[in-house]
Amino acid sequence: MTDVTVKSLAAEIQTPVDRLVQQFADAGIKKSDVDSVTQQEKEILLAHLNREHGSVPNKLTLQRKTRSTLNIPSTGGKSKSVQIEVRKKRTYVNTPEAEQAKAEEQAQREAEATAQKIAEEKAKREAEEQAKREAAEKAKRQAAEKEKVTNQQTDEKTKPAQTDKARREAEAAELKRSVEEETRRKVEEDAKRVAEEARKMAAENEGKWPEPVAEQTESADYHVTTSQHARAAEDENDAKVEGDRRSRTRGGKATKQKKGNKLSESKADREEARAVGRKGKRKPSTLQQSFNKPVVAVNRDVVIGETVTVAELANKMAVKGSQVIKAMMKLGAMATINQVIDQETAQLVAEEMGHKVILRRENELEEALMSDRDIGVEAAAEHRAPVVTIMGHVDHGKTSLLDYIRSTKVASGEAGGITQHIGAYHVETENGMITFLDTPGHAAFTSMRARGAQATDIVVLVVAADDGVMPQTIEAIQHAKAANVPVVVAVNKIDKPEADPDRVKTELSQYGIQPEEWGGESQFINVSAKAGIGIDELLNAILLQAEVLELKAVRTGMANGVVIESFLDKGRGPVATVLVQQGTLNKGDIVLCGFEYGRVRAMRDELGRDITSVGPSIPVEILGLSSVPAAGDEVTVVRDEKKAREVALYRQGKFREVKLARQQKSKLENMFANMTEGEVSELNIVIKSDVQGSCEAICDSLEKLSTDEVKVRIVGSGVGGITETDATLAAASGAIILGFNVRADASARRVVETEGLDLRYYSVIYSLIDEVKQAMSGMLAPEYKQQIIGLAEVRDVFKSPKFGAIAGCMVTEGVIKRNNPIRVLRDNVVIYEGELESLRRFKDDVSEVRNGMECGIGVKNYNDVRTGDVIEVFEIIEIKRTIA
């Protein structure tokens, strides 16, 4: 036989050549695609594959459908026909044991057939030999008898003739021929009879021998009976069920039958009947076998996100929601079916119910989007300009100092002369470029100062030499320490006569800011923003500190940064001031910024000039975002705008879910506070501001004004002008509208006039907070104080038919007025509190009696007045309360 190559063998068995070569290698035979393969190597490969994969058991699936029609009687004496289709399916598996048994049975049948054939041939030969012997013996007997007769005739006739002798010879030959034919015919008939009997016996054996084989094959399967027996049993059962049904529908009592049927019902049927109730109808007969398939608990792979409702968790496990709630109650957690639970709780519940939990990270898309960025890893990091944040107390000269550095008039443009935004500027000096962030110093702008400290490299702490350390100065120190950034102290207003730089050093040393000359690490520079003293020294100190820090950044690759400030411009849309920290931001880049996304349509520097690209440590205004981002959000340049949109929408939904979950969460310790919440007055406010940072600062400041009696509720807040939507929201919620550096449009003013809303404009945050305090003070419940205005001593008691007991009194102090509340004191103990009903002097009714005069006093509904009692007259005074 010619050897075949590996390539031709692969084509013959329809498998790739590489895979066949690998299989030969796994079997210990090294082959290439052009090598030949012998029969022995084929057998080695086949044995290896059988060991590796095993032989697949042969399966045989039989399906059978039987259709029948049943006439079921119904109400009204009519019967209806119901088509019934019974589907049955059996699978027979040909296991190796069954194959071996079948082979043994086949060998046994072949051996028996061979033995039978040998027995038939032997019987045939014996029958033929017996027939020949019998025929020979018969012929001999006939010949002997004939010879005997012939001898007798010869003896009787001593003279036979020659003709008689010839005739006798002819008769003897004829007799011999007839005997031989008779013998041959009998032998053939006997052989045919024996062969027919052998065929009948073989046919009977073939009908008898397969029965035990079939029974063994059926018993090897998981079915109890053969298909014929099962069909007979099913037909018998169907006939029995139909007979029972007809016996029930005939109208007879059949109490024993009903009782037997009730006993034969399964537990599940009884529970279902109990769940339906007594009013439900009797469950109709299902006309099926009473065998119920055993139920096995299915363990599923449950995929759980960061949050999931109880109903969703039940659907994932394919169970009822009540079962999940029961499992949670066993674990000590109470929940409703629509309540949102966290990932850990859902994992505990699912594992308790026997399922496998797969925790899903819902921010996989975000991680994939962030990983697919060109961040310029191969490029070397270069030196970058330091980001310097100017911090300090309000009115200590931060903006004026920066104004002198930039040689512009920024401070004069701020309302009230105080900074209310974060200003981002970069300036070119002789020694390099510096980026400045100017933060507000007012107490309301805590979060804005914290944002400035997080995005900065160096903090310049401005302290007035004549004012010293103030509350916002301490807060700025805390922000700088929290951000772990070095501090350069600028002692401002050094040109004033009352300036005391040493006092500033002493006060700052108490908060961990030690001067270099005292052994510390902070540089103290004496400056004057008005006179320009020490400005160059301050810049050199900043650059020296930056050189020590060795600030570096990668200029190539996709940019990322932070939002310093954001606002809504009427003509340009959402505008965000971004400080680039890594990479290069180009016009047309796709950016993901917190909850917002977009393509950079335009970029402008702090002077309003259009630019196309910007590197690290440079602030820039970008246009093109989907909405106004929150200040402090991280800005990242990505590749795919569609994925950026999906990530932004996911973040918005996640923020909304967390917010709702936080609102729904009710703790036991807040129960009493929630019960008394209805007694608290609420001041609803709608706030619109020019920039996001100011809006956030105002909301925080107003919410801190809330007390136990008056609560400030921010109904709506946003960036941009006051629109008709804002006015409608304020009208629906009964809120006042506060505009900070923004104005209302015509449609909003029309709604304000129609609804009579309170609309106020502000440009300084001081005024806004003070007026909100006044509005809250007007909502406070007034305080009432009791002020004693007179005392009268009872000298005698008279009886009056109209008023009862009348006390004759002497006014010892103050004034006694009629219809005022009084107290009756006996031994300095209040025994009665009521109202002065009658006041007379010399039988005349008077409205008041002054000190040192006598009078008669009638107390309403009180007659137990005695001599020596003291009547105290007082009045209730309302005291107006204010918010501290």
Swiss-Prot record:
InterPro entries on file: DNA-bd_dom_put_sf (IPR009061), EF-G-like_DII (IPR053905), EFTu-like_2 (IPR004161), IF2_assoc_dom_bac (IPR013575), IF2_II (IPR044145), IF2_N (IPR006847), P-loop_NTPase (IPR027417), Small_GTP-bd (IPR005225)
Location of this chain's protein in the cell: Cytoplasm
Record flagged with keyword Lipoprotein: no
GO CC terms: cytosol
Region of interest (G5), ranges: 528-530
Compositional bias (Basic and acidic residues): 99-209, 231-246, 262-275
Keyword Metal-binding (UniProt): no
Residues binding GTP, per UniProt: 392-399, 438-442, 492-495
Region of interest (Disordered), residue spans: 93-288
Biased composition (Polar residues): 216-229
Gene Ontology MF terms in the entry: GTP binding; GTPase activity; guanosine tetraphosphate binding; translation initiation factor activity
tr-type G domain: residues covered: 383-552
Stretches for region G4: 492-495
Gene3D superfamilies on file: P-loop containing nucleotide triphosphate hydrolases, Putative DNA-binding domain, N-terminal subdomain of bacterial translation initiation factor IF2, Translation factors, Translation initiation factor IF- 2, domain 3
Protein keywords: Cytoplasm, GTP-binding, Initiation factor, Nucleotide-binding, Protein biosynthesis
Annotated stretches, region: G1: 392-399
Biased composition (Basic residues): 247-261
Coiled coil regions, renumbered to chain: none
Family: Belongs to the TRAFAC class translation factor GTPase superfamily. Classic translation factor GTPase family. IF-2 subfamily.
Job description of the protein: One of the essential components for the initiation of protein synthesis. Protects formylmethionyl-tRNA from spontaneous hydrolysis and promotes its binding to the 30S ribosomal subunits. Also involved in the hydrolysis of GTP during the formation of the 70S ribosomal complex.
UniProt name for this protein: Translation initiation factor IF-2
Organism, as annotated: Yersinia pestis bv. Antiqua (strain Antiqua)
Taxon lineage: Bacteria, Pseudomonadati, Pseudomonadota, Gammaproteobacteria, Enterobacterales
